[in-house]
């Protein structure tokens, strides 16, 4: 039985509407699920014209009204914006507010059992904050409105999976957030996530923070004072956590099948290796030829 996926349209001034339309041109999507866009019908109609898509926009008031047929894009039309209300490619509070409200609505639908899962298009954090919604990203919005205290972000591309101790904070603050309790929390979330994905005995690689894992404290003591104690506590709890492993080698080992998931200490430490693997830029065409990978909220 096909499940209903609630798909946010993303920031209406950004690429979200176009991505949505292009993705739903593939008939295989409809073979595997029932996609329901949450957004503004007028914006999605413009995106259809812009990309030259042959499809019909079908506004609905409830997921039960969706047709879920290829060639028809069902959208829960919130009626927040029209094309003339904002400029494409420009940061604005109006677009940021709409993008936030799409996410809020899809969470509501999921919690009410009206959609089986959610998928989010990009939002602009600056625009969202201009609108008065002070969150640093999707992960934090989901955690807040589901009442989830323990959570993290996971990136995945094929068998490479990465979770993060911190994400959308400055590098200076990220270093301050490397604490035993938080590292242990993320290791535990990673272990449960792997088990939920069918990995019976997850092997968790934990990255260090400093060059060469601090070289015995010469280049920083986070590995000694925070990360290693967290790993030891996890192992005592029966979790197969290994490390700390130098950040410049742990991802090669993960790609080689040594770990099922990697715990990164901060945003770019985890994002860069995954995007090096999943993103391919064509020098001749001066365009991306592949952009693969997904961001999954855990907790």
Predicted regions and their residues:
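Helix-enriched interaction subdomains in cytosolic or periplasmic regions
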Residues: 121, 128-134, 157, 161, ...
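Contiguous, glycine/small-aliphatic-enriched amphipathic segments in soluble metabolic enzymes
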Residues: 1-138, 183-205, 209-265, 269-294
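Short, intrinsically disordered, charge-balanced linker/junction segments flanking boundaries
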Residues: 296-299
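Short coil/turn segments at secondary-structure junctions
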Residues: 89-91, 170-178, 214
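Flexible loop/hinge segments that line or gate small-molecule binding clefts
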Residues: 136-162, 167-170
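Active-site glycine-rich loop that binds ribose-phosphate moieties when present
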Residues: 140-149, 171-195
């Amino acid at each position: 039985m096909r499940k209903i996926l609630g798909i946010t349209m993303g920031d209406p001034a950004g690429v979200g509407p176009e991505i949505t339309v292009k993705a739903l041109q593939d008939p295989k999507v409809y073979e595997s699920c029932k996609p329901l866009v949450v957004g503004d019908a007028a914006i999605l109609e413009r995106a259809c014209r812009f990309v030259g898509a042959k499809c019909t926009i079908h506004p609905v008031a409830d997921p039960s009204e969706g047709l879920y047929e290829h060639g028809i894009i069902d959208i829960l039309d919130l009626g927040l914006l029209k094309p003339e209300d904002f400029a494409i490619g420009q940061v604005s509070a109006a677009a940021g507010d709409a993008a936030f409200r799409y996410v809020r609505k899809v969470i509501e639908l999921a919690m009410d059992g009206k959609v089986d899962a959610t998928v989010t298009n990009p939002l602009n954090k600056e625009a969202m904050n201009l609108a008065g919604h002070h969150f640093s990203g999707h992960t934090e919005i989901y955690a807040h409105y589901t009442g989830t205290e323990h959570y993290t972000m996971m990136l995945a591309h094929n068998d490479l999976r990465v979770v993060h101790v911190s994400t959308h904070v400055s590098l200076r603050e990220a270093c301050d957030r490397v604490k035993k309790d938080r590292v242990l929390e993320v290791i535990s979330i990673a272990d449960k996530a792997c088990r939920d994905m069918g990995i019976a005995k997850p092997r968790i690689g934990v990255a260090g923070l400093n060059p060469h894992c601090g070289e015995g404290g010469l280049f920083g003591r986070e590995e000694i004072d925070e990360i290693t104690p967290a790993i030891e506590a996890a192992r005592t709890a029966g979790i197969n956590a290994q490390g700390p492993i130098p950040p410049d080698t742990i991802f090669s080992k993960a790609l080689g099948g040594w770990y099922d998931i990697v715990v990164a200490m901060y945003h770019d430490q985890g994002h860069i290796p995954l995007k090096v693997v999943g993103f391919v830029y064509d020098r001749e065409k001066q365009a991306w030829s592949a952009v693969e990978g997904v961001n999954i909220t855990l907790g």
